[in-house]
């Protein structure tokens, strides 16, 4: 499986260094865990509070910034055979929110970002925690298993 990663860092912080190789490892671990084997493309945009707030309001009608948003690709079925790699979609991650949540939850910023990346990739693959309690439990279970493979503790444990 080949992963093409587009990384746009509109907001950066010395507290959270993002390395392309590490991001690809997290994405690949997530994809392999759920049995995904195709070449794919994923975009990640790291944004500030203002942009996160604007996007969250525009797409989710929530008037506040959020940690992460996922935008699954909407490629027509008939186009897929013409593509070398399947565009899975884009993730927008708000670095200031990630840093604040990590502090509040007593986690490292790297581990919290990794969790949100796993969570977002699962959304791009069609997993959804807002449709039912069962779906939420399935998604959380997958996140815990994937993060364990990356030597990251269960993010839902107090």
From Swiss-Prot:
Specify the domain of life of the species encoding this protein: Bacteria
Q: What is this protein called?
A: Endoribonuclease YbeY
Q: Which gene encodes it?
A: ybeY
Function in brief: Single strand-specific metallo-endoribonuclease involved in late-stage 70S ribosome quality control and in maturation of the 3' terminus of the 16S rRNA.
Q: List the disulfide bonds.
A: none
Cofactor binding: number and manner:
Binds 1 zinc ion.
User: Which residues does the annotation say bind Zn(2+)?
Assistant: 119, 123, 129
Known cofactor(s)? Zn(2+)
Instruction: List UniProt keywords, sorted A-Z.
Output: Cytoplasm, Endonuclease, Hydrolase, Metal-binding, Nuclease, Ribosome biogenesis, rRNA processing, Zinc
**Similarity section:** Belongs to the endoribonuclease YbeY family.
Gene Ontology molecular function, alphabetical: metalloendopeptidase activity; RNA endonuclease activity; zinc ion binding
Main subcellular localisation: cytoplasm
Q: Which Pfam families match?
A: YbeY
In the UniProt record, which is one GO cellular component term? cytoplasm
Location(s) in or outside the cell = Cytoplasm
* Any single biological process term in GO: rRNA processing
Q: What's the Enzyme Commission number for this chain?
A: 3.1.-.-
């Amino acid at each position: 499986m080949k992963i093409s990663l587009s990384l746009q860092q509109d907001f950066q912080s010395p507290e959270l260094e993002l390395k392309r190789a590490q991001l690809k490892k997290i994405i690949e671990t997530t994809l392999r865990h759920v049995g995904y084997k195709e070449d794919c493309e994923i975009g990640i945009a790291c944004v500030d509070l203002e942009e996160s707030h604007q996007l969250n309001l525009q797409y989710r009608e929530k008037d506040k910034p959020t940690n992460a948003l996922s935008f699954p690709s909407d490629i027509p079925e008939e186009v897929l055979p013409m593509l070398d790699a399947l565009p899975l979609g884009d993730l927008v991650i708000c670095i200031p929110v990630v840093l604040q949540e990590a502090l509040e939850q007593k986690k490292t910023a790297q581990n919290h970002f990794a969790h949100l990346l796993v969570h977002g990739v699962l959304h791009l693959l069609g997993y959804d925690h807002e449709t039912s309690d069962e779906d939420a439990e399935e998604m959380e279970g997958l996140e815990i298993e994937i993060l364990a493979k990356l030597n990251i503790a269960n993010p839902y444990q107090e």
